[in-house]
């Protein structure tokens, strides 16, 4: 989650209530270095804007790979190197295993009874195990392949009907990943899909940063200033209504079709799986409807934004680097030659395509600052004392572009991953697009599967370029940091249909 701040509220609080705040005389000695703090608001103004990951990377060049920030009442450390990341994500992983609690999670997720935002405790361990053993296993991810293939083909067909004008790939990718994730989570083309997606997007937009309540948690009377709480409560009320109906429909279907082991006829969606686990019982913490709602919200938020953003950046980089685009297309077109229908199995041998995706996620990690954690026990990192409740921000974006490890770090060069055993699981701390340690993303396989086939089909079926004769190097690559790191402007590209005989002419 990024650090976006409502400046009008901050200035209002600063001016109107200045006399209420006194600088505490209780300061923790031996904190990491950092930029000078202003009274009351600390370093908030330095993080104003849309590219906090870049600002923090620049500050780290001056203050070091571990840096202290004061965000109003919140004490935070920022880690910007793989060496220090190993300390906080591996060596002292347990000490930083709690999640920073934000107003979003407290309201929308009803006290954080999900997996993403819940603190590290017995309940979290139970629910994480359910996610890894029941919801996101390789077999379960593979069971949704028909959905991914169907929606990827729908993407191709929708582009074929709009070749007369530039194709808005940003919108296409959002529709694609919304459809895949919703069908996998709540069932085949649910009538609630469109509104549910809208609410998830609204939730992500509203909760895209620290609110006054997050910055000044001790001063409850200030929390009304931004109006965020009432907006979040309205979203939660509508989510409650929708999930009540979704769960009711699933329970009715299960009552009619489930077999002796509790499984419904046909392929289970994620709600079916959670209801089956709920009915089976035997858990230390029985699963409630609220728990199911929280976990499905996690899946919808992560599953839609992460994959669509990665596809957007992948096509952006490919168009900017024509030689890479041509090589990726040559591999795909050779592999798919003569095939009338392309399946996920056909993608598994596309080694260069996989390198393209890895390189895309190096330069454009979905959550460049990962999700903020919280220190649960005092520890010493690089000789500095980190107090309990200090927030931890890991700048995965800066680590992925560290010139001390990555040669020509700013260039898009998929072949840098050739013959290197670097995976997505955070085993190499120089490459952590999905985090590392016990709080890393459990849905990596689902996300990568959602990216690979659509990207391969776009490279096979179409020739791509910039509209209006614009040079590829002129493509706007500006970013905006919301729930994920997105393009600031939609990606509009020109496309022409590819026919296999082009290669022989």
Swiss-Prot record:
What are its E.C. numbers? 1.14.-.-
Residues noted as binding heme in the record, renumbered to the chain: 441
Its job = Probable heme-thiolate monooxygenase.
Its taxonomic placement starts with: Eukaryota, Viridiplantae, Streptophyta, Embryophyta, Tracheophyta
Protein's name in the database: Cytochrome P450 CYP71D313
Q: Where in the cell is it found?
A: Membrane
Q: Which organism is it from?
A: Panax ginseng (Korean ginseng)
> What family does the entry list?
Belongs to the cytochrome P450 family.
User: What cofactor does this one take?
Assistant: heme
Keyword field: Heme, Iron, Membrane, Metal-binding, Monooxygenase, Oxidoreductase, Transmembrane, Transmembrane helix
GO cellular component entries: membrane
Q: What SUPFAM superfamilies does this protein's entry cite?
A: Cytochrome P450
Any GO MF annotation of the entry: monooxygenase activity
Task: Please give the superkingdom of this protein's source.
Answer: Eukaryota
CDD domains from the UniProt entry = CYP71-like
């Amino acid at each position: 989650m990024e650090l976006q701040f409502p400046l009008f509220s901050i200035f209002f609080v600063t001016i109107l209530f200045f006399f209420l705040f006194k600088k505490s005389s209780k300061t923790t000695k031996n904190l990491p270095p950092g930029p000078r703090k202003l009274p009351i608001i600390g370093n908030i103004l330095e993080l104003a804007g849309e590219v906090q990951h870049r600002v923090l990377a620049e500050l780290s060049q001056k203050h070091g790979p571990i840096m202290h920030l004061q965000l109003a009442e919140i004490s935070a450390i920022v880690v910007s190197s793989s060496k220090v990341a190993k300390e906080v994500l591996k060596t002292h992983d347990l000490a930083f295993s709690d999640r920073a609690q934000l107003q979003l999670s407290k309201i929308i997720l009803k006290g954080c009874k999900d997996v993403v935002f819940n603190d590290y405790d017995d309940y979290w361990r139970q629910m994480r195990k359910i996610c890894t053993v029941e919801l996101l296993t390789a077999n379960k991810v593979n069971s949704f392949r028909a959905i991914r293939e169907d929606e990827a083909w729908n993407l191709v067909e929708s582009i074929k009907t709009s070749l007369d004008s530039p194709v808005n790939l940003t919108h296409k990718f959002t529709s694609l990943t919304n459809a895949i994730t919703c069908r996998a989570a709540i069932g085949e083309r649910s009538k609630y899909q469109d509104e549910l997606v809208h609410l998830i997007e609204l939730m992500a937009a509203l909760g895209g940063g620290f609110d006054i309540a997050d910055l000044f948690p001790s001063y409850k009377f200030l929390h009304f200033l931004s109006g965020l709480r009432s907006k979040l409560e309205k979203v939660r009320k509508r989510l409650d209504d929708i999930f009540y109906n979704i769960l009711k429909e699933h329970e009715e279907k299960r009552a009619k079709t489930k077999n002796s082991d509790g499984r419904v006829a046909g392929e289970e969606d994620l709600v079916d799986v959670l209801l089956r686990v709920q009915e089976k019982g035997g858990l230390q913490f029985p699963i409630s409807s609220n728990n199911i709602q929280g976990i499905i919200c996690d899946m919808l938020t992560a599953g839609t934004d992460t994959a669509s953003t990665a596809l957007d950046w992948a096509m952006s980089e490919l168009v900017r680097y024509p030689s890479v685009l041509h090589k990726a297309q040559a591999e795909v077109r050779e592999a798919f030659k003569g095939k009338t229908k392309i399946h996920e199995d056909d993608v598994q041998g596309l080694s260069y395509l996989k390198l393209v995706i890895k390189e895309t996620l190096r330069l454009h990690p979905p959550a460049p600052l990962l999700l903020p954690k919280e220190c649960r026990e005092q520890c010493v990192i690089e000789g500095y004392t980190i107090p309990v409740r200090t927030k931890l921000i890991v700048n995965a974006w800066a680590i992925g572009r560290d010139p001390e490890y990555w040669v020509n770090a700013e260039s898009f060069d998929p072949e840098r991953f050739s013959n290197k055993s670097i995976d997505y699981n955070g085993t190499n701390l120089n490459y952590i697009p999905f985090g590392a340690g016990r709080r890393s993303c459990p849905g990596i396989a689902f996300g990568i599967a959602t990216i690979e086939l659509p990207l391969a089909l776009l490279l096979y079926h179409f020739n791509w370029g910039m509209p209006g004769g614009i040079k590829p190097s002129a493509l706007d690559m500006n970013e905006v940091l919301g729930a994920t790191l997105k393009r600031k402007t939609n990606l509009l590209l020109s496309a022409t249909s590819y026919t296999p005989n082009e290669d022989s002419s």
